Design a protein with these regions (language model features):
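A glycine-rich phosphate/pyrophosphate-binding beta-strand-loop-alpha-helix module
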Residues: 47, 51-54, 58-108
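N-terminal glycine-rich phosphate/pyrophosphate-binding loops that anchor nucleotide-derived ligands
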Residues: 1-62
Length: 108
């Protein structure tokens, strides 16, 4: 699903659980997790949750005086999550990535 957001500058193809990146200088790296009932509640639309997760990562990198170029995506979802919910989350992630010209490098 994220192949359309992949980056051609990777040292290899888009990863599954990791990405091999050749930094051209200093690199700021950040990781966040968002939990239901802590960072959002069930009233928040799924696409907004996906969008917010990317926005949070961009904000963290910006706070370090750097510019985000790519993201790694990891989702811990219930086994019986609906396709509708999954694609809504993905849609929010994709929208945010397009807004900030980010590439999905891999994830879990």
């Amino acid at each position: 699903l994220f192949l359309s957001l992949g980056r051609s500058g990777l040292a290899g193809d888009i990863g599954d659980d990791a990405a091999v990146i050749r930094p051209s200088g200093r690199m700021a790296v950040s990781i966040d997790s968002y939990s239901d009932g802590v960072h959002f509640n069930r009233l928040v639309p799924d696409d907004s949750i996906g969008y917010r997760t990317v926005t949070g990562a961009v904000s963290d990198i910006s706070a370090m005086g750097s510019a985000a170029e790519s993201v790694l995506i990891s989702m811990g979802l219930p086994r019986k999550v609906s396709e509708e919910k999954f694609f809504a989350l993905y849609g929010g992630i994709k929208k945010a990535c397009k807004k900030w010209s980010l590439k999905v490098e891999g994830g879990d």
